[in-house]
Amino acid sequence: MSAESGPAPSGQATFVNTFTLRTTPEEFEEAFVRTARFLQGQPGFLGYSLVRHLEESRSYVNIARWADVASFRAAVTRAEFRPHAEALRAISTSSSALYTERRSATVGER
């Protein structure tokens, strides 16, 4: 059984990005991994989870966690990020937004 914990630590940001592919899942995942490697080296990056729709193999969601909004914005406005964003735009359409976690739960938490 899981238990709810309190709000997320102050300042953390969650970036949610949905993708609809115009290419194969394999090609998309390769491009995504290159982008993720770049972001993993940026200050404030905490982690990500890329998930694929169970029934629609061309539909993905990326959920990335950042220490704060400023770190996220600094990373995605770097000139070195541009080729990564362009590569993903060339093979998919996407929609994205920044969120702040309000509640979470994990197994065994009290």
Give the positions of each predicted feature:
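Short S/T/G/P-rich N-terminal loop/turn motif that feeds into the first structured element of a domain
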Residues: 1-60, 67-79, 92-110
